[in-house]
């Protein structure tokens, strides 16, 4: 009974908070209109002018308009229409914030809409948008601190849902491509792993240095060496597990760190660039096995980029940890001498 009461109180507090957030943000949106008037049209154009003036990296998502100035934005009819679309999206997100199910569903729909238009943006762009949107609103009206915090809250929850849904979509695309890459004890599965290493040794000779006594192997040598039968299955299993866990960010990151520690235990130290190159060669390997559409290539690039980032981060932490241990040993040695 007590648990039910506590749950009811928590639900009430969350609902009241969401209602207040919605109320504050909707009030500020009175200065960013959505209708057919010239004033509303200019409100939308002004948002894009602010974006193009202050966030030039975002221009690349507007094909053939990458070099636009604020004046170009003002004179292009595209932004009159697009400005109303983006403001409408902000109004809907704000209006539905106290209905989290609808808010999340609309957030996912916005991401899917961008995907259908072949516009793929990294997660940080969605976060940056709310910063620029708050700056834009600040030019239209005075935003007090509670209103700023309310927009921060909406932006944070929006970005969280985008990231969650985006990870599901990436996982789905990549898992589909792995249907053509069996792992197991069959001859086909064994050959899949060997083929990956043959591609590596043929096209990325610098990576051979990680294979002691096999640095001068040809693709034919790889084919004949039983080592690559077993190792091929290991590396493909790792790729399957990375893909399968991608929609669970914490598990994905933990598994990347486990892979790095496994290499360290084996005395294999690879330069950061190798981790980036691996995903490039893996995509090429998949392309040989089955045609990859652009969506799938992009999805693998997303996984590869995040993997490489985590691998590099782990390497830095490992190095710092070793240096700390060295300093500790030095201090201990000094104390022993005294």
Swiss-Prot record:
Residues in Globin domain copies: 25-167, 174-316
Q: Where is this region: Disordered?
A: 313-338
Identify the GO cellular component terms for this protein: extracellular region
What one GO molecular function would you report for this record? oxygen binding
The cellular location(s) given in this protein's UniProt record come to: Secreted, Extracellular space
Q: Which PROSITE patterns match?
A: GLOBIN
The signal sequence is 1-18
What Gene3D superfamilies does the annotation carry?
Globins (1.10.490.10)
Q: Where does heme b bind?
A: 82, 114, 231, 263
Q: What is its main location?
A: secreted
| Keywords (A to Z) from UniProt | Glycoprotein, Heme, Iron, Metal-binding, Oxygen transport, Repeat, Secreted, Signal, Transport
Q: Which Pfam families does the annotation name?
A: Globin (PF00042)
Q: Please quote what the entry notes about the protein's domains.
A: Consists of two tandemly linked globin-like sequences which each bind a heme group and a C-terminal extension which may act as a cement between the eight subunits.
Q: What family, per the record?
A: Belongs to the globin family.
Q: How does it assemble?
A: Homooctamer.
What this protein is reported to do is described as: Has an extremely high oxygen affinity. In a vacuum, it takes several minutes to release its oxygen compared to milliseconds for a normal globin. Could be used as an oxygen scavenger for sterol biosynthesis.
This protein is called what?
Answer: Extracellular globin
Lineage of producing organism = Eukaryota, Metazoa, Ecdysozoa, Nematoda, Chromadorea
């Amino acid at each position: 009974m007590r648990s039910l009461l506590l749950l009811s109180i928590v639900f009430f507090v969350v609902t009241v908070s969401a209602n207040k957030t919605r109320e504050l943000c909707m009030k500020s949106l009175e200065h960013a209109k959505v209708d057919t008037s010239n004033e509303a049209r200019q409100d939308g154009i002004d948002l894009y002018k602010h974006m193009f003036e202050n966030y030039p990296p975002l221009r690349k998502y507007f094909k053939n308009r990458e070099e636009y100035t604020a004046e170009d934005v003002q004179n292009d009819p595209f932004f009159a229409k697009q400005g109303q679309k983006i403001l409408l999206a902000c109004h809907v997100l704000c209006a539905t914030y106290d209905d989290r199910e609808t808010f999340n569903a609309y957030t996912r729909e916005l991401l899917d809409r961008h995907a259908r238009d072949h516009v793929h943006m990294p997660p940080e762009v969605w976060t940056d948008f709310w910063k620029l949107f708050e700056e834009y609103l600040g030019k239209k009206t005075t935003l007090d601190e509670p209103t700023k915090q309310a927009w921060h809250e909406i932006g944070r929850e929006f970005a969280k849902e985008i990231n969650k849904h985006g990870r599901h979509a990436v996982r789905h695309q990549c898992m589909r491509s792995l249907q053509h890459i069996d792992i197991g004890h069959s001859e086909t599965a064994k050959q899949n792993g060997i083929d990956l290493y043959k591609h590596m040794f043929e096209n990325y000779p610098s990576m051979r240095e990680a294979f002691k006594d096999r640095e001068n192997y040809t693709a034919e040598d790889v084919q004949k060496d039983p080592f690559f039968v077993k190792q091929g299955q290991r590396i493909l299993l790792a790729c399957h597990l990375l893909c399968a866990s991608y929609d669970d960010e914490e598990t994905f990151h933990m598994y990347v760190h486990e892979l790095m520690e496994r290499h360290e235990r084996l005395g294999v130290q690879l330069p950061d660039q190798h981790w980036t190159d691996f995903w490039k060669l893996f995509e090429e390997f998949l392309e040989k096995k089955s045609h990859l559409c652009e969506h799938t290539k992009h999805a693998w690039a997303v996984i590869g980029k995040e993997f490489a980032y985590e691998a590099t981060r782990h390497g830095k932490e490992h190095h710092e940890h070793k240096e700390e241990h060295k300093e500790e040993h030095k201090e201990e040695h000094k104390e022993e001498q005294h």
